[in-house]
């Protein structure tokens, strides 16, 4: 059954484009960790092709190797043939998901998260309200004091320790409407993609994004009908649900009639920018998706174009930057975040060795593959500590939580702060 599903889902021409040169191997975190050919992009593509050609039957080892992939796409920029590995691994996971039998509790968690929570923003706000109550009412302190969290896996305990303050309301409630006018002359009509998790766990970052855009001359439009971007769905094999979400977002932002669509999360932005590929076989939505994808920008691209750093406050601290994999490898945004950080008056920018290597967050990878994620994080934190930076900056919520967990794990709390680039820029640009 899996073989037939793979044959139906996989883009065979792209499989054949792999030249087996091996340039992807030094860029691949799982290959570098294990040294196994099967744990490299080249190896995984060879496995996909072998199954599609009928040379081998897909077994548990095949599925395990596909699931071990971070989906960081570090292999794509170094591939001379331009093989879209990210699309191939998502197609493979979609095929696996069609036939795989999960334990009942895994089915329940997946159904709850992917179909009943993430796609429904009102429910996400309700969940945020409950988390906020847990954090502020004294329940969290009591739970920690009584040691209740000891029953949870280590990675869950670490995440609870660094969980940001949740919000039960979104940016529309905060700003009192869906249109935030530009300060001064309007340069762009910018659609703000607020994200499902961002507006609950990183609401302050979203508010800062709106303020920075407005002060940079953007009229900010928050499309009310927008939903989750679908990235976690696509990465987990639920591509049909990702397509459903994509159609809703395309419709919402076309209705808003915006010039650009701004994301402040690398993972979301990369997904949004590839809606044209996701909906390529949908005749009704194909052109609409191209319209949408062509307008998606990361917040750093917009700010690098519009802001005047010499008006910023001085920040006499050492700063280093951990690049978001999907921002770098998916959206191809590399220079703008660094140029903004280097422009902060008084700050010393320190290049992070292998700052382009995945931190191990990779969506929910750190929860489902904790051993590999932990190994990558430990290596990353050794490199971070070597910079002696006061601030570790990133541009994606998952990376930010992973960096906070790494700081906690490495005993660097009080010595180093992990911060989203938007929050740092909002700090230095306050008048």
Residue positions per predicted region:
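Alpha-helix capping and helix-loop boundary segments enriched in small/acidic/polar residues
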Residues: 16, 35-39, 57, 233-240
């Amino acid at each position: 059954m899996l073989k037939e599903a793979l044959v139906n889902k996989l883009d065979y021409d792209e499989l054949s484009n792999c030249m087996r040169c091996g340039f992807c191997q030094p860029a691949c975190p799982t290959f570098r960790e294990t040294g196994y050919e099967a744990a490299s992009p080249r190896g995984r593509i060879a496995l996909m092709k072998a199954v599609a050609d009928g040379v081998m039957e897909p077994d548990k080892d095949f599925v395990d190797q596909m699931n071990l992939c971070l989906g960081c796409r570090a292999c794509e920029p170094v591939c001379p043939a331009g093989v879209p590995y990210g699309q191939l691994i998502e197609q493979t996971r979609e095929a696996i998901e069609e036939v795989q039998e999960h334990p009942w509790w895994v089915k329940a968690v997946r159904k709850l998260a992917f179909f009943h929570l993430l796609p429904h923003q009102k429910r996400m706000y309700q969940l945020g309200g409950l988390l906020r109550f847990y954090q502020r009412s004294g329940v969290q302190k009591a739970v920690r004091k009584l040691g209740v969290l000891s029953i949870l896996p280590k990675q869950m305990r670490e995440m609870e320790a660094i969980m940001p303050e949740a919000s039960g309301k979104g940016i529309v409630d905060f700003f009192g409407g869906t249109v935030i006018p530009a300060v001064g002359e309007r340069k762009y009509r910018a659609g703000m993609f607020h994200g499902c998790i961002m507006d609950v766990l990183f609401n302050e970052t979203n508010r800062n994004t709106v303020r920075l855009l407005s002060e940079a001359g953007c009229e900010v439009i928050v499309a009310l009908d927008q939903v989750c971007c679908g990235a976690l769905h696509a990465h987990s094999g639920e591509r049909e649900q990702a397509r459903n979400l994509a159609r809703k977002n395309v419709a919402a932002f076309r209705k808003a009639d915006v010039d650009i669509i701004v994301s402040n999360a690398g993972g979301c932005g990369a997904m949004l920018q590839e809606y044209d590929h996701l909906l390529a076989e949908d005749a009704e939505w194909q052109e609409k998706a191209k319209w949408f994808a062509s307008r998606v920008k990361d917040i750093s691209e917009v700010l690098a174009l519009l802001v005047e750093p010499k008006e910023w406050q001085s920040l006499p601290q050492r700063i280093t930057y951990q690049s978001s994999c999907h921002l770098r490898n998916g959206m191809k945004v590399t220079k703008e975040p660094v140029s903004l950080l280097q422009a902060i008056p008084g700050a010393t920018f320190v290049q992070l060795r292998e700052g382009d290597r995945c931190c191990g967050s990779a969506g929910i990878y750190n929860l489902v593959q904790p051993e590999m994620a932990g190994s990558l994080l430990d290596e990353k934190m050794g490199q971070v500590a070597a910079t002696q930076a006061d601030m570790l900056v990133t541009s994606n919520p998952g990376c930010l939580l992973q960096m906070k967990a790494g700081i906690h794990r490495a005993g660097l709390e009080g010595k180093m702060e992990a911060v989203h680039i938007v929050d740092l820029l909002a700090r230095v640009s306050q008048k």
